[in-house]
Amino acid sequence: PVDGIVTVGRWNVGVQGSGREVLLSRTQGGLVSYTFNNREFVLRRPAVTTFRALTDNDRGAGHGFERAQWLGAGRYARCIGNEIEQIDENTVKASYTYELATPQRTKVTVSYTADTTGRVNLHVEYPGEPGDLPTIPAFGIEWTLPVQYSNLRFFGAGPEETYQDRKHAKLGVWSTDAFKDHAPYLMPQETGNHEDVRWAEITDEKGHGLRISRAEGAEPFAMSLQPYSSFMLEEAQHQDELPAPKHMFLRVLAEQMGVGGDDSWMSPVHPQYHIPADQPMSQDVDLDLI
């Protein structure tokens, strides 16, 4: 057995072991602290996202108007329930039910299974919502990290950014950073996504950081590491409106719609690269601190 402690309290659930500490909040709806040798990796808890910053092609095709509900659906989602299950003396699972801020109030589940090795499994599930709803721009989580964790090494399609409809890339291990991955478009927009990722390491200059890998039997995921959140990119009209980076923003996605671009302005995304709202989606990744 691993030398560690699992503490199930009224407000929080804590797991300690191997120099790592995991703190899951009942009231705040998820992971509120994740440390390794006192290095903190959570500035804001990983939050459900159903949105991506509009691209020039999105704007030209009217996607903002058509998909406005998804901008707020994840951002204003509320936690309506939680369930704590102690699996054994070294493992605990915290499951949260979120209600998306849509007229349908679709329920999304987010669960963390943590053990005393300090590893955490993160599972996010969208059940699909029947009805005539606009397609979803993206689904997964966005996580705010301290600014020093700006280096990215990943095993996936690369080395440049890739999307469902932009995959002229090779599968391999690639190294980049959040600043290189931020394309300075005249009008800020979605940028820096990587598809078909098996694992990714987000580190500081000393190599300390976070490792994300697809769980056993799970599909590869999409991800990006940026010095700006998707909402900061969406709000800015020009690059000079973006502030000096104070945090890093990690997006880990089950799926993201394509970006289109058969021409330079009004070319919509082809139907096969949309995400139907009635399509169930899940994301299953393992987290570890390095």
Tell me what each language-model feature is.
Residues 1-290:
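Beta-strand/loop-rich accessory regions of lumenal/periplasmic or secreted enzymes
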